[in-house]
């Protein structure tokens, strides 16, 4: 009896050991499978991430290639303002890098022109000349635009999109101040007015137009040069390229009558100062501490904004490629429209603008941002 009991206990113990071993083996097998599964999932996750990055890289390469192909096909063209008969010329500006600002040893430089920074610029077109009264008047005087279109046989209903753009109230003084209109640069507008013109022009033409950024303006003005002016450092040559205080007969002159810069742009030095989009800061380009692409300092304050190029009133030093000048609220002290339209007119008879058209069309949100840099009237 005792012997049988001992045998039974031995058999039970043996089965228990076998069971424990099987359980242990099964547990290890399960853990191994789980680890294999986790390793596989991790590998799949890494693979997915690499695949996504690869897709992003491929997309970037495709876009870059397409942009290069598009840029290679960029040519000068003449833009027509629908229904009016008015036209203006646009010049292609290639992408590239340049040193923005003036070196410390440049004569007559100001602190706000530095420090010099290397900047990358995307391709765009720029108007060959400053915006003329011939084009701007159609925006400023809505009734004149309608009359011109009617004479040319166009129905008012074709203007619905451009008619929705805000425009100035009709000024009660002659805005050229007797200096001439046909072929002369438009003057005395606020930055907001220039922006609204660009918006109206885009609606009229089907091409996206805006003011240039400060970096785009200087890049186009320099046209590959590193000197104080696009024609070199010798101020004695300035009469060939610019209207300024000593040769302007105390008024602006017809656009495009002086020599162009190396890229075919006229009056980048002198005639009228030109609005750009950026906020003005006295410490210049300190925010650019490395190579930056298409920089643009969006304005949070109404004053000051940047103007470029110098004007018919200025000295040669103010016409340098790197020279910059801040806008002032004083320019509105004798606003010919006060108090009705403080958003559109100034008495700054030296101030105008020219338009640019980026090669790549931005989103509608970006368009709105560029067109509302001076805020919107209440």
Predicted feature residues:
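Short, small/polar residue-rich loop motifs at catalytic or cofactor-binding pockets
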Residues: 258-261
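Surface-exposed recognition segments
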Residues: 106-119, 225, 248-251, 269-378
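Mature N-terminal segment immediately following signal peptide/propeptide cleavage
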Residues: 84-100
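Hydrophobic alpha-helical segments, especially N-terminal targeting/anchoring helices
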Residues: 81, 266-269
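Active-site microenvironments of metalloenzymes and redox enzymes
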Residues: 51, 100-108, 120-231, 237, ...
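N-terminal pre-domain segments of enzymes
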Residues: 26-83, 364-378
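Chymotrypsin/trypsin-fold serine protease catalytic domain
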Residues: 226-252
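Classical Sec-dependent N-terminal signal peptides that target proteins to the secretory pathway
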Residues: 2-21
């Amino acid at each position: 009896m005792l012997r049988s009991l001992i045998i039974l206990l031995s058999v039970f113990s043996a089965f228990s050991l076998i069971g424990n071993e099987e359980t242990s083996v099964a547990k290890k097998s399960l853990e191994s499978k789980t680890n294999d599964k986790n390793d596989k999932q991790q590998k799949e996750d890494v693979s997915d991430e690499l695949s996504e990055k690869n897709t992003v890289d491929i997309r970037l390469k495709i876009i870059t290639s397409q942009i290069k192909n598009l840029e290679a096909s960029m040519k000068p063209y003449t833009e027509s303002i629908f229904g009016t008969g008015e036209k203006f010329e646009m010049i292609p500006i290639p992408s590239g890098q340049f040193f923005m600002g003036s070196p410390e040893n440049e004569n007559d430089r100001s602190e706000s022109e530095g420090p010099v920074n290397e900047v990358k610029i995307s391709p765009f077109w720029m108007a060959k000349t400053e915006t003329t009264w011939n084009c701007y008047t159609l925006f400023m005087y809505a009734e004149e635009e309608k009359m011109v279109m009617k004479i040319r046989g166009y129905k008012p209903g074709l203007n619905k999109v451009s008619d929705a753009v805000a425009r100035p109230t009709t000024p009660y003084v002659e805005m050229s101040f007797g200096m001439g209109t046909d072929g002369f640069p438009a003057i005395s507008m606020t930055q907001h007015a220039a922006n609204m013109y660009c918006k109206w022009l885009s609606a009229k033409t089907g091409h996206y137009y805006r003011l240039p950024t400060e970096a785009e303006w200087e890049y186009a003005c320099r046209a590959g040069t590193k000197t104080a002016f696009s024609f070199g450092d010798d101020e004695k040559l300035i009469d060939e390229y610019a209207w300024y205080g000593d040769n302007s007969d105390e008024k602006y002159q017809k656009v495009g009558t002086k020599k162009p810069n190396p890229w075919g742009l006229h009056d980048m030095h002198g005639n009228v100062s030109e609005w750009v989009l950026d906020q003005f800061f006295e410490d210049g380009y300190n925010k650019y501490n490395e190579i930056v692409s298409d920089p643009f300092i969006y304005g949070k304050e109404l004053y000051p904004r940047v103007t470029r190029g110098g004007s018919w009133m200025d000295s040669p030093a103010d016409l340098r490629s790197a020279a910059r000048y801040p806008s002032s609220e004083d320019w509105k002290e004798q606003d010919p429209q006060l108090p009705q339209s403080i958003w559109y007119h100034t008495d700054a008879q030296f101030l105008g603008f020219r338009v640019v058209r980026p090669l790549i069309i931005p989103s509608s949100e970006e368009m709105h941002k560029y067109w509302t840099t001076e805020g919107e009237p209440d």
